[in-house]
Amino acid sequence: MEEIAKEYDVIVLGTGLTECILSGVLSVKGKKVLHIDRNDHYGGEAASLNLQALFKKYGNYNSGEEPWAKYGRNTDWNIDLVPKFLMSSGELTNILVSTDVTRYLEFKQVAGSFVQQGSGPKATVAKVPSDAAEALRSPLMGIFEKRRMKSFIEWVGTFDLKDPATHKGLDLSSCTMKDVYDKFGLETGTKDFIGHAMALYLSDDYISKPGGAPEAIDRIRLYGNSVARYGKSPYIYPLFGLGDLPQGFARLSAIYGGTYMLNTNIDELLYEDGKAVGIKATMTGIEPEMKFETRAKMILGDPSYFSDKVKVVGHVLRAICVLKHPLAGTSDADSCQLIIPQSQVGRKNDIYIACVSSAHSVCPKGYYIAIVSTIAETSANHHLELQPGLERLGKIEEQFMGPPIPLYAPIEDGTSSGIFISKSYDATSHFETTTDDVKDIYRRATGEELKVEGLRDLQVAGDE
């Protein structure tokens, strides 16, 4: 093990994806990084577990039993605790390509992107239309609405914020997305799947935000571009699950001189004049344990290391389910995302279903892993909140559901304390909100915008 330096530019606590992207990018940019995790594995709350570890985590069995044994080899299972897909033209994909982390991972397309209309047994599950031709074929709309949707999608494709001739007479600096929808005469159900299954908004707040239309149009366009990249769906997902994503960035950091320490507890944060200047820590799992102290210009980390500096902003509910069949209504897709917009089932928050299978090497052949997620809206009976999603799954072989998971956000921006804290992973089934957080932390910590495009050039220059 290499010697601990007396001082680093950055100390990072926790090996979740947000933290690993930041340590990788900062290392590439020439910063001296020490990256620590109290666990013996990478990933933090977003790790991937085998089936036995999942049973043990949730306590779904009695002492002396081994319920996982009937599901084949343990090593064939890689189950994500936080289910998320990557948009093929999204920010995380751009960061992966720009940093060349793609060389450590293999991605495969997610077979379908679906949305539910209505509720209960009679609900319609259909592919989210991503272009004008699909809009005309979609069972989600009547014949006249299909034409309105077709003209809306075509307009999104030609829209240019800098060219008022493409603005349909709307003042984009002040108009709302409701004004845009009304311009095309779109029905409520159509607005629902555009806003929630294409633009991927979590609630309907975006509709009435003055000046918010350009952002919504960008998000709809990102969806369309991501579908166009590979066809079928806008999502991709790594073979063997998401657990390898943080490790890919950890490798990147290590190549550029980053130091990684697992099994290491933080005993104390050191302050001078109210600003964090270092840590006291103990590395366990070795004889004898190694106690050390080191300093840093700034400290980044996940909320679990800073309980006095974060607040709870909500709770996420997740049920991890093992199935022996694909989801109904998805044309037997081996993997898919299904979004149930909140208004369809009388809720304030959407319900997300992410389904993967042996096609992505996360379980043995013949099995499917479906994870249902939403934001808690009540204080009890949380399984009832997930019920509209669980109903879509058919017969469930095993179901793992713990108590509501708190969502944390930092209380302050970190500029005065020198501590920059990430947000918890939300209920969305994609990484766009995570990369927003990465960029936000980078901006707060360095005072600069994170420019993804030039990262590979920096690396090449550093390799010479």
Swiss-Prot record:
Task: Provide this UniProt record's keywords sorted from A to Z.
Answer: GTPase activation
GO cellular component entries: cytoplasm
Segments passing through the bilayer: none
Query: How is the subunit organization of this protein annotated in UniProt?
Result: Interacts with the GDP-bound form of Rab GTPase YPT7.
Q: What is this protein called?
A: Rab GDP-dissociation inhibitor
What gene, per UniProt, encodes this protein?
GDI1
Organism, per UniProt? Answer: Pyricularia oryzae (strain 70-15 / ATCC MYA-4617 / FGSC 8958) (Rice blast fungus)
Q: Name one GO biological process term.
A: protein transport
Q: Which family does it belong to?
A: Belongs to the Rab GDI family.
| Pfam entry (one) | GDI
